[in-house]
Amino acid sequence: MAAPVVAADSPVIENMPETAGGATENSAEAQKRPQFGTRFLTDPRQVFQHNAWDNVEWSAEQEEAALKKVQENSQPLPAEKQEEFDNRANEYWNDFYTIHENRFFKDRHWLFTEFPELAPQQKHLRGAEEKESLEHMLNGEDISLNPTHDEFPGASASYRILEVGCGVGNTVFPILKTNNDPGLFVYCCDFSSTAVDLVKSNPEYDPSRCHAFVHDMSDESGEYPMPDHSLDVIVLIFVLSALHPEKMQKSINRLGRLLKPGGVLLLRDYGRYDMAQLRFKKGRCLSENFYVRGDGTRVYFFTQDELHDLFSSAGLEKLQNLVDRRLQVNRGKQLTMYRVWVQCKYRKVLAPT
């Protein structure tokens, strides 16, 4: 099925990558999807043979046209309007999930291909020798691989995953479905209390394996239910872009403290000059590369360097930082659509260098 063509101001445009290729996929097809970067368009005449093509390089003319389009809509809204969108951000997301409930996004089975760290074949239990080696590498820092804080959800787990911005569970439930490891525990949080209520009301929600909670990752005073240095993986899928740019660094710093030494942060988000950015009309710009959608939710479009600076400043080292330039095709209408996403893996440094 080809990717839909919808109005530029619709949140569907911004959220089309929920299947990573833009086309709707059933679960079996999604799990078989090859990793990004394996389907290349070598003959432009064959563009309509598939729904999507990987690593499509832009011409200088395309880059120039994209920059011009962004500059045309670069006049920011008045400060009082920006403050309103910031103060009412949770209301807009609650309204979004009240309207759409669990019908808007597809389950993200493609994540197991792009991020094998989430796949069930991963070995989550550290051997005694590896644990001893990691503790030695901490050079005497007051950090334990098994935090001895008061009891917390998932305290007995051997492998802990946190998804920030979980929505209605389109990442969490595929993880729980496919991973029967008794040592696995998944945390998930969202800014929207409506979204978290929908997660908890899902028949597949199991409090013995999962803990859902409301949390604003940009709130410095907000508490997480797990202690620092307790998480193996943190997942950020199209969520960091919803924050005000000035709040991003402190939010990542806080998440970094939750990771165990050697733990990883996985991100996929909107890239600079993505089709969604170029389709914004005048009167939607909040600040440079930061916009408000018609429903009041906000979105930022990143470069690789911006994300690298955010993560490295939080003490994380790069494992992967790539641009996914995807040419999506609507074969029925003979249309081409250029998507740009950034995908990152960053690891918490084991010891000071």
Swiss-Prot record:
<keyword id="KW-0949">S-adenosyl-L-methionine</keyword>
<keyword id="KW-0808">Transferase</keyword>
<feature type="binding site">
    <location>
        <position position="237"/>
    </location>
    <ligand>
        <name>S-adenosyl-L-methionine</name>
    </ligand>
</feature>
<keyword id="KW-0963">Cytoplasm</keyword>
<feature type="binding site">
    <location>
        <position position="216"/>
    </location>
    <ligand>
        <name>S-adenosyl-L-methionine</name>
    </ligand>
</feature>
<feature type="binding site">
    <location>
        <position position="93"/>
    </location>
    <ligand>
        <name>S-adenosyl-L-methionine</name>
    </ligand>
</feature>
<dbReference type="GO" id="GO:0052735">
    <property type="term" value="F:tRNA (cytidine-3-)-methyltransferase activity"/>
</dbReference>
<dbReference type="GO" id="GO:0005737">
    <property type="term" value="C:cytoplasm"/>
</dbReference>
<dbReference type="InterPro" id="IPR013217">
    <property type="entry name" value="Methyltransf_12"/>
</dbReference>
<dbReference type="InterPro" id="IPR029063">
    <property type="entry name" value="SAM-dependent_MTases_sf"/>
</dbReference>
<protein>
    <recommendedName>
        <fullName>tRNA N(3)-cytidine methyltransferase METTL2</fullName>
        <ecNumber>2.1.1.-</ecNumber>
    </recommendedName>
</protein>
<dbReference type="GO" id="GO:0016427">
    <property type="term" value="F:tRNA (cytidine) methyltransferase activity"/>
</dbReference>
<dbReference type="InterPro" id="IPR026113">
    <property type="entry name" value="METTL2/6/8-like"/>
</dbReference>
<keyword id="KW-0819">tRNA processing</keyword>
<comment type="function">
    <text>S-adenosyl-L-methionine-dependent methyltransferase that mediates N(3)-methylcytidine modification of residue 32 of the tRNA anticodon loop of tRNA(Thr)(UGU) and tRNA(Arg)(CCU). N(3)-methylcytidine methylation by mettl2a requires the N6-threonylcarbamoylation of tRNA (t6A37) by the EKC/KEOPS complex as prerequisite.</text>
</comment>
<feature type="binding site">
    <location>
        <position position="190"/>
    </location>
    <ligand>
        <name>S-adenosyl-L-methionine</name>
    </ligand>
</feature>
<feature type="binding site">
    <location>
        <position position="165"/>
    </location>
    <ligand>
        <name>S-adenosyl-L-methionine</name>
    </ligand>
</feature>
<feature type="binding site">
    <location>
        <position position="97"/>
    </location>
    <ligand>
        <name>S-adenosyl-L-methionine</name>
    </ligand>
</feature>
<comment type="similarity">
    <text>Belongs to the methyltransferase superfamily. METL family.</text>
</comment>
<comment type="subunit">
    <text>Monomer.</text>
</comment>
<dbReference type="Pfam" id="PF08242">
    <property type="entry name" value="Methyltransf_12"/>
</dbReference>
<dbReference type="GO" id="GO:0030488">
    <property type="term" value="P:tRNA methylation"/>
</dbReference>
<feature type="region of interest" description="Disordered">
    <location>
        <begin position="1"/>
        <end position="37"/>
    </location>
</feature>
<keyword id="KW-0489">Methyltransferase</keyword>
